[in-house]
Regions:
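TPR/TPR-like alpha-solenoid helical repeat scaffolds
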Residues: 248-260, 314-330
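Substrate-binding/catalytic groove segments of enzymes
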Residues: 296-300, 309-315
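TPR/TPR-like (Sel1-like) alpha-helical repeat modules
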Residues: 240-242, 304-311, 340
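Beta/coil-rich, acidic/histidine-enriched accessory regions frequently appended to metallopeptidases
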Residues: 330-342
């Protein structure tokens, strides 16, 4: 087993403030926590696995180690972005860890942020998510993650101006963070402000030219603007930095459908669905592609699948511009009501 540097500088743009070491924390538990955070900042599948292994050992040694529980909750939650397919128990374990963090230290901002994140994406309990994220900000107003997740929760609820204000607060705290710059672009895109999103993506990419998420949001905005050459070029940049994966292939089908290359998109989509058991792609992306192809029946089938699988993108179905083709269909309103999004 390769050991992480126990005092490695945490300079990743994803790093969030964390409570100072408490005098009573067991030395070994503290070392495991520090190593776990080091691996977690890598934001890769293997990094998250390594982080979880160490954080689980830390809380086993010190069951009231709130900061370790909060970090563990985030790692389990993030498996839903970085593992394909996500482990089916990831969200349940994230929820257990977040609740354990709050129980261990009700005044730890990170604990409430972690629980708010679970309430948003797993429980889809908007009221509780907002309560937890706002409490996290009250406890630590400089916690970037709390501001970012709260902004996303506001976007998901359709409260776009509030979301923009909230994410701008994060940018004021860390103006050079490419993660926050990308989050600003994402919030603008969800608000339908595509020109502003394009400008913001370029700012984010100036900070981190390899930021896959910024390239993705830039492509989305170009698609919505009907800027076909630009959208296709943005996808090629995505592909360069993300590599050839099943998700990248789905993104290819997405951009082809959005730019009018319908038959090519259908061919790729058929392969994606037939091979999904071996080459997993989130059901939410499949639903979006069907929406772009104006195949409503299949789009709704896959949206229901996304709900059942707790696909993270489904949290934003209410406001996602990719689903605009479906909004006039009565089934869309029924779907939102049945999933607590109306």
């Amino acid at each position: 087993m390769v050991n992480a540097p126990l005092a490695a500088p945490l300079t990743s743009p994803y790093t969030r403030p964390v409570a100072d070491t408490s005098p009573g924390i067991d030395d070994e538990a503290q070392q495991l926590f520090t190593a776990g955070r080091y691996y977690a900042t890598r934001r890769t599948a293997e990094g998250l696995r390594q982080a979880i292994e160490r954080l689980e050992r830390a809380v086993a040694l010190k069951p009231d180690f709130a900061a370790a529980w909060a970090e563990l909750a985030d790692c389990y939650a993030l498996l839903n972005w970085f593992i394909e397919p996500p482990p089916p128990e990831a969200w349940q374990r994230a929820k257990h860890a977040a609740l354990s963090a709050v129980s261990a230290d009700p005044l730890l901002a990170e604990a409430h942020a972690s629980l708010g994140f679970v309430r948003l994406h797993y429980d889809r309990n908007w009221k509780d998510a907002e309560h937890e994220l706002r409490k996290a900000i009250v406890l630590n107003a400089r916690n970037l993650v709390s501001h970012r997740w709260y902004a996303y929760s506001l976007s998901a609820m359709g409260r776009h101006e509030e979301a923009i204000t909230e994410i701008e607060r994060a940018r004021e705290i860390s103006p050079q963070s490419p993660v926050i710059a990308t989050a600003v672009a994402n919030v603008l895109f969800l608000a339908g402000r595509f020109d502003d999103a394009i400008r913001q993506c370029h700012k984010a990419l100036a900070l981190d030219p390899g930021g896959v998420a910024a390239h993705t949001i830039l492509r989305w905005a170009y698609e919505k603007k009907g800027m076909v050459p630009e959208a296709l070029a943005a996808f090629e940049q995505e592909r360069v930095f993300a590599g050839e994966t099943p998700t990248t292939r789905a993104k290819r089908a997405h951009v082809l459908a959005a730019t009018g290359h319908l038959e090519q998109a259908r061919e790729i989509l058929a392969d994606i669905i037939s091979e999904r058991s071996e080459k997993w792609v989130t059901a939410y992306e499949i639903a979006i592609i069907y929406s772009l192809l104006n195949d409503r029946d299949n789009a709704f089938f896959w949206l229901h699948t996304a709900d059942q699988e707790h696909a993270v993108g489904f949290t934003f179905a209410r406001v996602d511009p990719h689903l605009d083709n479906l909004r006039s269909d009565p089934r869309f309103g029924e779907l939102l009501r049945s999933t607590n999004q109306s």
